[in-house]
């Protein structure tokens, strides 16, 4: 791994960790439920990308599979939360 790539991956890890912390703060302090749902989606994306960057840094494919599971769980939870906010129930 070149020093430039190592620096870029380290910087990306810190930036994504900061984004995840700020999204978690937005979940706790969001004034409306819609803000909390968007912050949850941002948290899922930041966590997924953090797993991918860490997998690139470690050179292991196992974290990519974990990132895929996080992406699917994030999609399902976002769709169900949006449906609940829109109609007031998830299952009709």
Swiss-Prot record:
UniProt GO molecular function: sodium:proton antiporter activity
InterPro entries the UniProt entry points to: MrpF/PhaF-like
Location within or outside the cell: Cell membrane
Alphabetical GO biological process terms: potassium ion transport
Principal place of residence: membrane
A cellular component annotation (GO) from this entry: plasma membrane
Ion transport found in the keyword field: yes
Protein's UniProt keywords contain Zinc: no
Superkingdom in the source lineage: Bacteria
Positions of transmembrane segments: 4-24, 37-57, 62-82
Membrane topology value: Multi-pass membrane protein
UniProt-listed Pfam families: MrpF_PhaF
Keywords: Antiport, Cell membrane, Hydrogen ion transport, Ion transport, Membrane, Potassium, Potassium transport, Transmembrane, Transmembrane helix, Transport
Family: Belongs to the CPA3 antiporters (TC 2.A.63) subunit F family.
PANTHER family named among the record's database cross-references: NA(+)/H(+) ANTIPORTER SUBUNIT F1, NA(+)_H(+) ANTIPORTER SUBUNIT F
Protein's job: Part of a K(+) efflux system involved in pH adaptation.
Protein name (record): Probable K(+)/H(+) antiporter subunit F
Organism: Rhodobacter capsulatus (strain ATCC BAA-309 / NBRC 16581 / SB1003)
Gene, per the UniProt record: phaF
